[in-house]
Each structure stands twice: as structure tokens, then as C-alpha cells.
Curated annotation (Swiss-Prot):
<dbReference type="InterPro" id="IPR000415">
    <property type="entry name" value="Nitroreductase-like"/>
</dbReference>
<keyword id="KW-0560">Oxidoreductase</keyword>
<keyword id="KW-0288">FMN</keyword>
<dbReference type="InterPro" id="IPR029479">
    <property type="entry name" value="Nitroreductase"/>
</dbReference>
<comment type="similarity">
    <text>Belongs to the nitroreductase family.</text>
</comment>
<dbReference type="Pfam" id="PF00881">
    <property type="entry name" value="Nitroreductase"/>
</dbReference>
<keyword id="KW-0285">Flavoprotein</keyword>
<dbReference type="GO" id="GO:0016491">
    <property type="term" value="F:oxidoreductase activity"/>
</dbReference>
<protein>
    <recommendedName>
        <fullName>Putative NADH dehydrogenase/NAD(P)H nitroreductase AF_0226</fullName>
        <ecNumber>1.-.-.-</ecNumber>
    </recommendedName>
</protein>
<keyword id="KW-0520">NAD</keyword>
């Protein structure tokens, strides 16, 4: 698949079939996440993979009761790992860790699309609850919950602002 076709084909999927995502496919998705750009190549991001139905339900409740999270066969929580970046960049490393994590999130979403699966970037959640549920160390911040599965819907791409409205040349 052409790269640009993939970018424009990606949509948010919130309805999944009950078909599982096998471990080999999951590893490809995680490897794609890890291939994302990274400040200083410090890769200040970590992935928590959840298949346990009860844990997925608790995550859904912590994410404003977005129950489609619990219905996905697998969920990846992408986390920023602050010390991994701060050891080189100091306090600014916090921002770089968050950038590393968000770059990985987009790679994961694109890999999912390339593999004919579906996913959605969930950013609306209670960070403290998610951290507690997943027993995250205090120096790690959950950045996104990504439910992944075989799509049970085929939504149309969402409308976007015209690029001309968002683009500034030479200055604002």
C-alpha cells in the first residue's frame, strides 16, 4: 500500500468483531510503534498490552465509560517514560518523552490500518486511575489508550480543515 494512501485511509474504529488479534500481528504493531522518531534515539516510551477482560473494563470506566475499549480484543496503553529522556535532556526531556510517545501512537495507528485492523486514539481518561489500574511507576505517564481489533464498522473519513486554513508561510 502506498504510504499516502495509508495516511488518508486511516479512520477511528470504535466497533470491533470478537476475532482475536494474534501475537505475531501484535508484535508487528508494537515494532512499528518503536520505529517512530525519538529525541536523541532515547525511545522514551513504553507499551502496556492488555488482553484481560476485567482490566479492559476498568480502563474503559477510567476513560469516561468509553466501553468500546473493553470490547476490543487487545488494548495498548502508550506511556511516556520521563527518566529515559531526562537523563540526557534534563527537565526538557519530559516534553521529548511525550513527543516520543505520541509519535509511537501515530505509528501504531498506521500499522493497524496497514494490517487491515482498526483502532482509535483515546486521550480522554483519568491518568491517575489508569496509572493505578496498570501499576505504572510514578515516573511514567499514560499518553493514550489504543483499543485494537478487527473492524465491525466502516466509517467515512472525517472532514478536515483545508490545509490553506492551517498553513502559514514564512510567518504567522
Amino acid at each position: 500500500m502506498e504510504c499516502l494512501d495509508l495516511l488518508f485511509r486511516r479512520v477511528s474504529i470504535r466497533k470491533f468483531t470478537q476475532d482475536d488479534v494474534d501475537d505475531e500481528i501484535l508484535m508487528k504493531i508494537l515494532e512499528a510503534g518503536n520505529a517512530a522518531p525519538s529525541a536523541g534515539n532515547l525511545q522514551a516510551r513504553d507499551f502496556v498490552v492488555i488482553r484481560n477482560p476485567e482490566t479492559k473494563k476498568r480502563l474503559a470506566m477510567a476513560a469516561l465509560k468509553q466501553m468500546f475499549i473493553a470490547e476490543a480484543p487487545v488494548v495498548i496503553v502508550v506511556c511516556a517514560n520521563y527518566p529515559r529522556s531526562m537523563r540526557v535532556y534534563g527537565e526538557r526531556g519530559r516534553l521529548y518523552a511525550e513527543q516520543d510517545a505520541t509519535a509511537a501512537i501515530e505509528n501504531i495507528l498506521l500499522a493497524v490500518t496497514a494490517l487491515n485492523l482498526g483502532a482509535v486514539w483515546v486521550g480522554a481518561f483519568d491518568e491517575e486511575q489508569v496509572s493505578e489500574i496498570l501499576e505504572l511507576p510514578e515516573y511514567v505517564r499514560p499518553m493514550a489508550i489504543i483499543p485494537i481489533g478487527h473492524p465491525a464498522e466502516n466509517p467515512s473519513p472525517r472532514n478536515r480543515y483545508p490545509v490553506s486554513m492551517l498553513t502559514h508561510f514564512e510567518k504567522w
